[in-house]
Each structure stands twice: as structure tokens, then as C-alpha cells.
Amino acid sequence: MLESERRFKPKIVGATDGDPSVDFWLIDGRLMPRSNVEKQLPRGAREMSDLSIRIGHMDELNIDVQVIYPTIFIFPTARRPEVDLALCRSYNRWMADIVKPAPDRFRWVVVPPLLNMERVAEELKFGKEHGACGVYMRGLEADRRLSDGYFFPLYDAAGRLDLPICVHSANGSIASHDFFLDEPGFCKFKLAVVGAFHSLVNDGIPERFPQLRIGIIEVSAQWIPYAIHDLARRHLRRGKQLSKNVLKDKRVWVTCQTDDDLDYILGYAGEDTLVIGTDYGHADNASEIEALRKLRDEGKVAAPVIKKILDDNPRALYAL
């Protein structure tokens, strides 16, 4: 952080009952849980303080490249634009430093300061120049849907820089997040992202920005048939026909899970738009450290399709 921004630095605070297993981030007057950590992994690997340990584990898991997503930003972290800018700038520079020793093994998604739209393009440019291969977004941002015209400068910049927007299971709206505060995350995080996909496609964002690629990350893929069916009905009411290969035509990729009904989903998604991840370092219902190996070994779908999910499709999404 810049010296002038250090007053915005996140603080770690403990539980009032003294429970050492529970602590929180305090950022801009808001408490956010500092949890969801897979403690069975070595700390050096989990927090990337020792890349050799993490790379060794990646080799065991047959993972060539990891694309790193943030944890703290799944919540709406800042109320004030100046805090948002300080957090995003410092995170992006921290990540650039971390991955610098192993650029062939680690890529990352740059976090844009969306309360400071006039500063977004420069952060995306910094990310692109320092190993970022995507732009992090949440299902709702700045109390707006992602199809809102407010985000058009971001989409234009991302398209020009060949960076996909990667809509991760998360919520950047304080009002929506806090309404679902005690809810486990299905409505708060996952449905916000499904809604983001629907609004982006329904409101014609892929057509408005023909260079833009979109990733829908860490919300399973089970929802795809329902969302596409709903979009098709809405298009018909407007006298339009939804294309038969919606995801491919709109340049949308979606992460699946190994326990998804892949045969059914592939009928709607096609073979060229599914990817998969491990949620490495986390401990929630999307975490699946052996996901790549499991998908390959279980053989639920044909081997050429598995190769696309594990290799061809992520290369296309992230321009690797």
C-alpha cells in the first residue's frame, strides 16, 4: 500500500468470547469472517508463502497451471471509493509479486476497483502486464447488476486487453449480502452469479462487446439448463430466437463439478464451454482438491470431452 493508504489496511480481530479458532477481518468498519480455510494443506502452500511446496503438490495432482482467485473479495469489502482503490491496488501488486518467480505455473485474476471506474483500466493494464489472465467480478457489484451501463468501460477495457471477466461465487452488494447475512451462501453468493449470467445474456452484453469473454466460476453447472430454458422463453416473447449453442455463441465458459450431471448439462452447454477447478486452499462445498484427477479417472463422459474440460477449454477462456 502507499503510505497515504496504510490507514485503510485490513485488521485482524478476535471473537469477543476469546475463541482462538474464530477471527475476522475488519475493513472499512465492516467485519468479515476470516475462515473457510483448508487447514489440512501446508500453510506455505495454502497461502503461497512457499511456492515450492505448492508446486510440488500441483505436480502430485497433475495440475500444470493454477489460476488464483482471491478469498477476501467474496464479500463487499469497502464502503468508500478510496478504501476500495487501496485494497484492490495493494492486492494486485501483492499477487504480481507472489507469482513472479513461477509465471509458467501460476496465473491470477486482477481485482478492479469498481467504486473508482476511472481507475479500472489502469489496474487491468497492470494485471495484464504482470501475469493476470482474467478480471475478478462478483455476482452483484456496487449495488448494480452486471449488465448495467456503469460497467461498460470495464468490459471495453477487458475486451481490448484480451482478459475475460470472471464472475466468481461472491457478492459485492452490501445491501444484498447483508440481507442474506445468516444464510449459508446459496442465495447470497451462488444465485447472485446465476442471475449475473442471465442478465448479461438477456441484456445483450456479449453482442455489445464482441471481444469480451465471460467466465462463470464456482457455482456448479447444474443451473445451466434452467437458465437457458428461461432465456429461450423470454426471447420468444420478444420475437427472437435464442441460439442453440448459447454459451459458445456468447463466449461464456462455466466451471462444473465432478458430481454434476454432466451428460445432461452437456446437452445444453456443449463440449467447448465447461471448465473445472479445485478451489485450492478453501474448505467449503465447492472445494474439490482432486477434481481434475477424479474427472479423468471416473470417466463419466467420453475421454475427448474430458480433455476439453481439463485442457482445451481453460486455454480458450483464459487465453493461456
Residue ranges and their predicted role:
Residues M1-L320:
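Helix-coil boundary/capping segments in enzymes
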